[in-house]
Amino acid sequence: MLRQVLHRGLRTCFSRLGHFIASHPVFFASAPVLISILLGASFSRYQVEESVEHLLAPQHSLAKIERNLVNSLFPVNRSKHRLYSDLQTPGRYGRVIVTSFQKANMLDQHHTDLILKLHAAVTKIQVPRPGFNYTFAHICILNNDKTCIVDDIVHVLEELKNARATNRTNFAITYPITHLKDGRAVYNGHQLGGVTVHSKDRVKSAEAIQLTYYLQSINSLNDMVAERWESSFCDTVRLFQKSNSKVKMYPYTSSSLREDFQKTSRVSERYLVTSLILVVTMAILCCSMQDCVRSKPWLGLLGLVTISLATLTAAGIINLTGGKYNSTFLGVPFVMLGHGLYGTFEMLSSWRKTREDQHVKERTAAVYADSMLSFSLTTAMYLVTFGIGASPFTNIEAARIFCCNSCIAIFFNYLYVLSFYGSSLVFTGYIENNYQHSIFCRKVPKPEALQEKPAWYRFLLTARFSEDTAEGEEANTYESHLLVCFLKRYYCDWITNTYVKPFVVLFYLIYISFALMGYLQVSEGSDLSNIVATATQTIEYTTAQQKYFSNYSPVIGFYIYESIEYWNTSVQEDVLEYTKGFVRISWFESYLNYLRKLNVSTGLPKKNFTDMLRNSFLKAPQFSHFQEDIIFSKKYNDEVDVVASRMFLVAKTMETNREELYDLLETLRRLSVTSKVKFIVFNPSFVYMDRYASSLGAPLHNSCISALFLLFFSAFLVADSLINVWITLTVVSVEFGVIGFMTLWKVELDCISVLCLIYGINYTIDNCAPMLSTFVLGKDFTRTKWVKNALEVHGVAILQSYLCYIVGLIPLAAVPSNLTCTLFRCLFLIAFVTFFHCFAILPVILTFLPPSKKKRKEKKNPENREEIECVEMVDIDSTRVVDQITTV
């Protein structure tokens, strides 16, 4: 009883609101436009988010704490040449992969000379500034001897060239660790790619060579010069490529990922304009009909204007509050399109059910009472789900900002639909009541006055006048609309046909089977190349890097951050055990081998162990570079102690798999907790992948929970709680199918796809809730009759919004960007699967599942029978229209 009272009370409130808006249409039409112009004007000076890490790396993660600890001991900016990572290397740098089209050996004489010429050209790059020209020597990272740090492969190639010049045949390159002429052992696993080896790891050939040039960025001037040097670096590599057409070069810099991420917005512009034109055309066609008076083409256009005003207002507010633009915002207009269009088409559908002899104010009040309650509840669902996503519980900034922007846009869209679109409906209502042309707004003459006009003129002015319409035909004046006619006369009878139902059920079982198959293969996508435009430096470099340099993982720093008994043999065994199985670049292991070669026991007393380490081992030229890996401290009694040290580990992998690397990280972390030696592991890529899975799923998980809670509490606002049960089951079915099919379509579970899944919850409720409500609340008659009625009442609005949404998505498929490709596939699946449920699954399943309907009992008395039929006809359509009843 309470639910019915609340339901009727809300309908009455919306009816009065509609009457009030119809009484002041000019104010409610102009106010949203003025607000949008004032707030949207600030968007002309929008700022672009520059930091990809800020957007896509989890905000709160253990890796960031570990990075701070590592930085306090061994600054990462100076160590980045040791901590190799493909796309996440910190600071400024330029990198190039050199390979051959014919898969030639890059270590032969010709290619060796070519690469050394490229190296010389890169080091001579000049960045002009007022009064000074900066070269690589001015902005490079310096070694202890004040020389620029360059990749060890450059020294290897120089030694190889000298060996050939002097006809020395004893020079050999080993892989993945080789020795230079000064005795240093260096790791070359990420500098030589596509390697073929002889016995004892001697390199026979290499298909690719990678060079990296690390730059300083210690202040703003230095950073600006380094950024310009990176741009000149790419230009130099391209010019070198043109003059040496037999080799292929893949340049990459620290700015490439950011620029290619932002490039998505630029390459999407003309496709979005095409999408807008198609949506406008389809919306106008969906609102048009042959009757030139009752046709509403302007409402189709004004519905899109309403959505545009809300989006512009939200963008202005985000900009005024200090928000910055990023390419993920491309999905916001499509979120608005799915929600806003259905609301406007539902209002138009309700308008068609009102009586034409009523005043416009009364018709508008009836429209608001009929459609605004469901639209308000679905809007509340959007606000709650996206609001949870915009909360601090969301650990990925890109997802949080997207949800925040969507929340603001949806809120203003709701207000503008109530005001701007409602007043537009009032204006078109007056045009209709005055029998004016729906496009040209001129009085339409009666058919008698058009007899002498040309056929095309009579066609343009086709209209039905009330005095020419029989009383019983008044409710059918809108049935000349193509979609209304299609649903009422053909589709409703076909989908509820007894012979069609088994095929639909079979098709649904196939749908569930394929969805389950895809669901079991869901993979998490933390690859940053999935968010950038295609045919860019990032994509080309990543493809080459995975092809030639995926044999080994990124270099993992192994940091012992407290003083331990390095001289103790049991501690030595523990440290060696922890690093066993990795390719190691370790001062500790080298020092122990050094002692063994001198026939000195590794279990020396502490003082002897430390003195020999400082005064003998680190003084040797081949081991002097290890000085950066050890931190000594003097105690009060002048005793020297090793307070912290680091080693570098590389894991052998068949392929650089993010999940495999994350599992390795978690394994090492668990080991650090239980081990006697206190250590941490770090690589810059860990900042992006640490807790990525939980951070990624949190917005979707929280949104699902909030949606369930809202459905539970909204059961008190709807007339029957069974509506919410059906909505929940439908949402589960749709989301399950979308996740499964997007996996089969090679879409990983990343930031973009998770945001689309959150939107999918709301899109499903948006389209299915009104239809389910009409079915569940129906009294008497059969389930089949009420399924047909629900489709007739709400099917047109669903079909209209679906057609507009799909034509708007189609141009998105052609955008040359991985981000928009993911966006298109997810949104298309959401729209298609929801449409499949609305027009196939639900109409069939509802015919044999609860709630049951009481069959009408026919009365023997003809007078009673006529009265009962009149009442039932009113209940079926739940409108103010009563068809002519003939009972004889």
UniProtKB/Swiss-Prot annotation:
Task: Give the glycosylated residues.
Answer: 77, 133, 167, 319, 326, 568, 599, 608, 762, 818
* Effect upon mutating residue 51 to N: Found in a patient with intellectual disability; uncertain significance; no effect on localization to cell membrane
**Superkingdom of origin:** Eukaryota
Topology with respect to the bilayer: Multi-pass membrane protein
Q: Which SUPFAM superfamilies match?
A: Multidrug efflux transporter AcrB transmembrane domain (SSF82866)
The tissues where this chain's protein is expressed are given as:
Widely expressed, including in various regions of the brain with highest expression in the gray and white cerebellum, followed by the cerebellar vermis and the pituitary gland.
Gene3D superfamilies according to UniProt: Multidrug efflux transporter AcrB transmembrane domain (1.20.1640.10)
Q: Where in the cell is it found?
A: Cell membrane; Cell projection, Dendritic spine
Outcome reported for the amino acid change (mutating residue 479 to G): No effect on localization to cell membrane
Q: What is the effect of changing residue 213 to C?
A: Found in a patient with a neurodevelopmental disorder; uncertain significance; decreased localization to cell membrane
| Outcome, altering residue 73 to F | No effect on localization to cell membrane; no effect on localization to dendritic spine
Supply the alphabetized keyword list: Autism, Autism spectrum disorder, Cell membrane, Cell projection, Disease variant, Glycoprotein, Membrane, Synapse, Transmembrane, Transmembrane helix
Q: What sequence ranges are listed for the domain SSD?
A: 268-427
Gene Ontology CC entries for this record = dendritic spine; plasma membrane; synapse
Listed under GO biological process in this entry are: chemical synaptic transmission; cognition; excitatory chemical synaptic transmission; inhibitory chemical synaptic transmission; long-term memory; short-term memory; smoothened signaling pathway; social behavior
Which residues are in coiled coils? Answer: none
Segments traversing the membrane: 20-40, 273-293, 298-318, 328-348, 373-393, 407-427, 502-522, 707-727, 738-758, 795-815, 826-846
Q: Which disease is it linked to?
A: Autism, X-linked 4: A complex multifactorial, pervasive developmental disorder characterized by impairments in reciprocal social interaction and communication, restricted and stereotyped patterns of interests and activities, and the presence of developmental abnormalities by 3 years of age. Most individuals with autism also manifest moderate intellectual disability.
**Protein task:** Required for the development and function of the thalamic reticular nucleus (TRN), a part of the thalamus that is critical for thalamocortical transmission, generation of sleep rhythms, sensorimotor processing and attention. Can bind cholesterol in vitro.
The record's similarity note reads: Belongs to the patched family.
- This protein's name: Patched domain-containing protein 1
Organism, by scientific name, is Homo sapiens (Human)
Biological classification of the source: Eukaryota, Metazoa, Chordata, Craniata, Vertebrata
